[in-house]
């Protein structure tokens, strides 16, 4: 059996795919003039379809997002089917809260590496002062230097050295190198 024949006999869903694309294209075509729409390549049309889908999903999730530029030009109808021109109370509709970076940090906790940088340098991690576990207790006793002071003390003298010198291992056996002279230098 030839592989090309098997591909030709396989059932295809071109009718369903083209129907979905046609509906999506009709949905987007209302934002463009006929001339603009005819000049556009199908790949550009697909990009606009996905831009609109992304806008719809983000607004349904509760994010405050701006309209894509192509949807702003006509302002014909939003994705819910409301007519902007006839809706006088459009501005009075309930706005969803805007997600900020801080609120996202509360939702998704920080992912810490297994070995923080302080532990690699021989320093221990000091827990944060805020939170229900600590209840305002003093984390660093007055006699002990704080983590910041330890970092400043350890990093101060290293500033003059190269950054990679602490990574070099010390040789256990000394190697003595002999200088080889060039015959050209001997002639002089």
From Swiss-Prot:
Residues 145-155 have a biased composition (Polar residues). Pfam families: SSXRD. Residues 116-127 have a biased composition (Basic and acidic residues). Keywords: Transcription, Transcription regulation. The keyword Flavoprotein does not apply. Residues 116-167 are annotated as: Disordered. SUPFAM superfamilies: KRAB domain (Kruppel-associated box). Belongs to the SSX family. Could act as a modulator of transcription. This is Protein SSX4. It comes from Homo sapiens. The lineage of its organism: Eukaryota, Metazoa, Chordata, Craniata, Vertebrata. The gene is SSX4.
